[in-house]
Amino acid sequence: MKRRDFSLAGGVALAAGALVLPAARAQTTTPAQVQGKAPQAGEDYLALDKRVPVDAPAGKIEVIEFFWYSCPHCNTFEPALDAWIKRAPKDLAVRRVPVAFRDDFVPQQRLFYALEAMGLVDQLHRKVFAAIHVERQDLARADAIAAWVAKQGVDKAKFLEHYNSFSVATKATRGTQLQNAYKVEGVPALGVAGRFYTDGTLAKNMDRALQIVDFLAAGIRSGR
């Protein structure tokens, strides 16, 4: 989903997860097409004009997934991303960063970082997507989010303590700063090593975007 689509969408569409993906992102690419042409800078991925600081330890290649819980395409991408993470080389450090293209995205940013602070991302991350896109629940506001989290067996008071904390607010702000530093134009999107950016529009689809990340990581290992 492109940034301009978020700007044009109304509150009803946001809650329903009914925003439309640009045609370019929905296109498919066959394995033969991927193998027949090496990814090209400026076409399949972007090299950032200014490097972005990374959080990965020395010797690790940081890969960031930018996402939004209410984005249907992020929901669709999750199984493929999870499978890719499981088979990724050990030198890749993968982390998720929720975006905030508008102020009303911030509650879901805080949701993710509160779950992270409580060690509940592995347990509840996919369930958040399911609640929004399968059960059609509106988790766009703090009260609805807290009520849903409580139904998952999480102490509501402790969750809200994290949700409203300075540390979670700071992480949300830094997430938005990181999104802007990478010049994220839509989600899902992938940032690599503070140097490269790709998404479904550039790569033609997100499966190929992951292949491009593999290509870029290989280049970093070889000193390119």
Question: Can you say where each PLM-predicted feature lies in the sequence?
Answer:
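Extracytoplasmic thiol/disulfide redox context detector
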Residues: 2-103, 218-224
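C-terminal cap of thioredoxin/glutaredoxin-like
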Residues: 5, 151-224
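Extracytoplasmic/secreted proteins, especially bacterial periplasmic and envelope-associated proteins
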Residues: 62-65, 76, 80-83, 106-110, ...
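Sec/Tat-exported extracytoplasmic proteins
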Residues: 67-70, 81, 85-88, 115-119, ...
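Solvent-exposed loop/turn segments at secondary-structure junctions
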Residues: 70-73, 100-104, 131-134, 167-168, ...
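Structural microenvironment flanking redox-active thiols in thiol-disulfide oxidoreductases
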Residues: 87-118, 122-150
